[in-house]
Amino acid sequence: MKTLLRPAVSLFVLLTAVTGVVYPLAVTGIAKVTFPEAADGSLIVKDGKTVGSSLIGQNFSDPKYFWGRPSATSPMPYNASSSSGSNQGPLNPALVDAVKVRIEALKAADPDNKLPIPADLVNASASGLDPHISPEAAAYQVTRVAGQRHLLPADVKALVSQHTEGRQWGVFGEPRVNVLQLNIALDSVSK
């Protein structure tokens, strides 16, 4: 029995040290050298204070800000520790009701807006934490944000254009706008 126990415990301790200490430290060290900003969570710092991450959406509900995609995390929106999709199918009555409520909220916030509401403003992303919206979703909100901030819509459109990211490596994905970065830029312009 002792002849089996000693190698088993030794192997357990060795593998725990390698997989629990050495490997994570090595990967973190390599990441900090090769991708220093991303290794720390792509944090956005404004005036010496961390205001969020460029990788995780935030809940903006004030009409003077651009709003991101709805969050699928519960019970608290945009909770990174409970990232998941809603898993509701397109015919699920709960999803249909949620989308109707979101459409009404968008219409109530900007009743004069007659543009079609982009799908990403009423549907959550697969992770429930997407920090981006489409340029169309940003364009839909320009008049509301400009009016709330007493800015010219053309100036707000220009800001949206400046913060529109292209396809990943020019090939993958679609153009997108990071909502947090756009709202930070808006705050800088509005001061």
Swiss-Prot record:
| Assembly, per entry | The system is composed of three essential subunits: KdpA, KdpB and KdpC.
Identify one Gene Ontology CC term for this UniProt entry: plasma membrane
What species does this protein belong to? Dechloromonas aromatica (strain RCB)
This protein's encoding gene: kdpC
UniProt name for this protein: Potassium-transporting ATPase KdpC subunit
Pfam families, alphabetically?
KdpC
Membrane topology note: Single-pass membrane protein
Which residues are listed as membrane-spanning? 11-31
Q: Which HAMAP family match?
A: KdpC (MF_00276)
